């Protein structure tokens, strides 16, 4: 098993989560991993202060996967009415490609269904990341046809090229 423990984030984890997310989304040159977007977006994906703001909100959680005491994966889940937004899915680049992202996504969906009563999961993916969109489609997500501008004002990085877009995907919860 790739992780030993799944749990929600504590305030004391904010720095480790920010480091993991930035390592996964915007790694340094020479670091492998298939989910990074360094060629599309520059700057940090998140900051400690942004993680702290997320943790201060109600109906939102960051779930982490630990190997020993090290945070090696995370995902953010935020309730919005009858659905939940899922984002900031990150896996340490060394562990990518072994199923941990799929496991974290499934756990996020279960958490949203069980704790928030979510009927649908929604996420935004950089539209030019065809391999990442294909991953989510294999997990049961569907394209909504909704495409928005990259959220430059959100403090999640600066597009390297004009016109960067985000495609909105959704998945219905499997309530049984």
Placement of each model-derived feature along the sequence:
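Conserved GNAT-fold acetyl-CoA-binding loop/helix
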Residues: 22-51
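Conserved acyl-CoA
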Residues: 103-120, 142
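Conserved N-terminal entry element of GNAT/NAT acetyltransferase domains
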Residues: 1-15, 167, 171-176
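C-terminal "cap" of GNAT-fold acetyltransferases
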Residues: 54, 119-134, 138-176
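Active-site acidic-Proline motif in GNAT/NAT acetyltransferases
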Residues: 79, 92-98, 127-128
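Conserved acetyl-CoA-binding loop-helix of GNAT-fold acetyltransferases
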Residues: 91, 97-110, 138
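Conserved beta-strand in the GNAT
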Residues: 64, 70-78, 85-90
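A short helix-loop-beta-strand connector motif used in the catalytic cores of GNAT acetyltransferases and
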Residues: 46-63, 162
């Amino acid at each position: 098993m790739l992780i030993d423990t799944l749990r929600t984030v504590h305030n004391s984890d904010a720095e480790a989560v920010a480091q993991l997310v930035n390592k996964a989304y915007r790694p340094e040159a020479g670091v492998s991993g298939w989910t990074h977007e360094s060629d599309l977006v520059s700057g940090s994906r998140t900051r400690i202060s942004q993680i702290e703001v997320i943790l201060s909100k109600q109906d939102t959680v960051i779930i982490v996967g630990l190997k020993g005491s090290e945070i090696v994966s995370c995902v953010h889940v935020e309730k919005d009415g009858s659905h939940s937004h899922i984002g900031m899915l990150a896996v340490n680049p060394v562990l990518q490609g072994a199923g941990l992202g799929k496991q974290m996504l499934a756990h996020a969906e279960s958490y949203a269904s069980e704790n928030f009563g979510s009927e649908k999961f929604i996420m935004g993916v950089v539209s030019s990341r065809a391999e990442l969109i294909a991953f989510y489609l294999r997990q049961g997500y569907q394209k909504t046809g909704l495409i928005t501008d990259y959220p430059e004002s959100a403090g999640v990085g600066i597009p390297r090229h004009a016109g960067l877009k985000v495609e909105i995907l959704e998945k219905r919860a499997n309530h049984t």
